[in-house]
Amino acid sequence: PEPMTEREFAEHISELASKNEVFTSYIGMGWYDTVCPAPIQRNVFENPVWYTSYTPYQAEVSQGRLEALLNFQTVIAELTGLPLANCSLLDEATAAAEAATMFYGSRSRAQVKAEANTLFVDENVFASTLAVINTRMIPQGIKVVVGDYKTFEFTPDVFGAIVQYPNADGSIEDYKEFIVRANAGGARVAVAADLMSLVLLTPPGEWGADVVFGSSQRFGIPMFYGGPSAAFFATKDEYKRSIPGRIIGISKDAYGHTAYRLALQTREQHIKREKATSNICTAQALLATMAGFYAVYHGAEGLKNIAGRIHASAGFLTGELEKLGYKQLNKNYFDTLKIQLPEHVSINALREIALECKVNLRCFDAGQIGISLDETTGPTDIGVLLYIFAGAAGKDYMLKEAVPEKTYFDPKFARTSEFLQEDVFKKYHTETELMRYITRLGRKDVSLAQSMISLGSCTMKLNPASTMLPLSRPEFMNIHPYAPEDQVEGYTELIENLSAYLCEITGFKGCTLQPNSGAAGEYTGLRVIRAYLESIGQGHRNIVLLPASAHGTNPASAVQCGFTTVTVKCDDKGNIDLEDFRAKAEANKDNLAASMITYPSTHGIFEVDIKEMCDIVHACGGQLYMDGANMNAQVGLTNPGTIGADVCHLNLHKTFSSPHGGGGPGVGPICVAAHLVPFLPQHPVLWGNDLNTVSAAPYGSAGILPITYAYIRMLGTEGLETVTKTAILNANYLAAKFKDTYGIVYTGATGRVGHELILECRTVKERSGIDEGDIAKRLMDFGYHAPTLSFPVHGTLMVEPTESESKAELDRFVEVLECIWNEIKEVEEGKASKEDNVLKNAPHPEYEVTADEWKHEYPRSKAAFPLEWLHDSKFWVNVARVDNAYGDRNLIPTLCACEI
């Protein structure tokens, strides 16, 4: 499209927003209206210090968000009654699939030998959850059996079960006896739980659940037409080596001070690749952070008040509806009522009155209505609901009494255990204190608000403020994903336009926005390929060719999709070895399903043989999957369709400027050629079809889409091309600066790099004993986040400057690395100790530099202020180098009173 100015776009997006109608939604089914506390919205959600940071792999410059995510894990562990929680997954439905996959991978030897492959799912889980389970289980050879948990008989082939609490209709069920039966048969049980209900209800961990998962959306996160929001996942300690997703753990730094870090990373795809327990990479860190702050702000008593008010309102509403002649079918419930209409009441008439009152209700078959109350429901809302139901019954009603505080479910379901008694959940209950706590944590982190983040293959570009502003509009925030079509015309137009733009950019014919991350996009693309092959009688094809340089998510996604991976060598110039590629494609031509190729490659170069590789795959009966992680070097210059690919995924949080959020949210849409369009993901609720459903919501994290839409509309065709050229130019500028010092590991046929470059650090280690990790830690003393460490080549640093950085910032980065180079030279030449030097001891926290005692051979000034400009702008790390081995040997994944 033609580019818009910021002012023109502001007017345009206002017009689109006005086409969305914000009704009061009682649909429920996993999404509920909430109150996002203003200090959290203002100081986290709308604060670039929080939304522009990267996943906290570099712990020393991530202590703030690591602490915030540890708070989240503590909330989840204590509310679920289980000792171990991760720091978020993509959504509730994919968390269900992750639980099933974990159970399958954790089968006993006897179960593996007996080929136990049946998963039981109760019939009263959310429809979207069941759809995603089916999508994810079938390729792994797992049989999904749906039935009534009360009557299901466990047999030796059943390895796991999934139930909902309260169930999809809102009923609180007693699963204790079911779990006893499951355990007796060797099956493990996962419970999909409503997090807010666990404030009042007995935690599933206390009655034997092996996993408890769900959505934390109710903790202050808007509905956003389906997302983003953070899923949670808690389990027993015995699964700590197989739990999916990232875990924050408490460790210590070089001086014994408490420090936080990502724990047990050897489970994850970037290390284990095809043997990983999950393909998940980007999750929902920003939303988990917000949910954690919500719990910090309200504390245990505040949460009890909120949950109690929701439940009391539901109970009061039940009594008043029964006076009007309606019947409530749920004997025990938390917030959701299932109402049977009397014969003389028309469901259509009731819906018509509801819509006139701007109210959305859930409609079941057989004349039943669902009402899910939430945090925002007040006496006026209850009065409107009773007016609707009275009108449909031909009666008058006026609310005359206040809602009494009362419990309406059987006392046996009531929670008796305390939760959130740690200091952090007691200290910050005023806006002033919370604001200062959030600010203190933010100061401990490096984000794009501080300096360039040059992580290779991560594309840490600017998230323009003008693209972020629409997210705070209620017309985008407060829409339920199952709202009627005529209430979401603005979203519909935006989604259709954005899909068309992405198709044009990629050269493809179809697009889905449903995947919630790049890894989810990979899985979706492979699932679409599998469905297509099955449709043409080629379902036996199960081999995926992968270059040795592939992102770890590629092999992990392929295995999750039921494929077998075959690795192709790379030559000494960093290219995929064409002859090895050809030989392995030919050797597997009868079973070749696909090849996954990143372009430019993860080695930072444009593969000159890319088209020939596409032709080879097609000649052998396979499909070409292009990993879009590096699309920032393609947009406007070429595209996957032109090159010859059949499908690609995009990372909106990389190429298209939506924020990384410290580890999510992400969006990983896929675009496909015409022959694959019929196999794109559907949705059971909105479209009545569960083909290849990969996310809980029909459009995934729809709330993020206005960012990318704004980015494309304001840049226009020429602007997008200029972005790509500038990104490549910046990378080559840095390559020219570093080629005579560190050296560049790979360059392309023209002697240039793509949009990223790999710095050679292996020879540095040979000469001085200084390794790439030491360089990464020393960069922190200058206020910089490290480049990508030891990927895709061990012993190197991969740098991607993006188009967003000015020449002045690039030159500052060069100056810093040249300073570090000179420090390395001092070690090589014997001018500095090989053991006690600024690199081996980096980073240097303020408490160390300002201590009375200084034990190092070099001066404090060299440690903290090696360059003059640091006196004007100094970022202080909060901890010294973190002890990773200690943290993994002593996993502490929640706040506790233990001594370190």
Regions found by a protein language model. Give the residues of each.
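Conserved PLP-enzyme active-site core in the AAT-like
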Residues: G64, T94-A259, L321, F334, ...
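Conserved phosphate/anionic-ligand binding catalytic regions in large, soluble enzymes, centered on
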Residues: I221-A234, E238-Y239, A283-L287, S372, ...
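N-terminal export/assembly segments and adjacent metallocofactor-ligating motifs
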Residues: T55-R65, N71-T74, N86-L90
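A conserved hydrophobic secondary-structure block that centers on an alpha-helix together
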Residues: V75-A96, E115, L119
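Non-catalytic terminal extensions of PLP-dependent enzymes
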Residues: E2-F23, V35-Y51, Y57-E60, L69, ...
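Short helix-loop-beta connector
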Residues: L82-P83, G507-K509, Q538-H540
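General small-molecule cofactor/ligand-binding pocket signal
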Residues: A85, K143-G147, L329, R362, ...
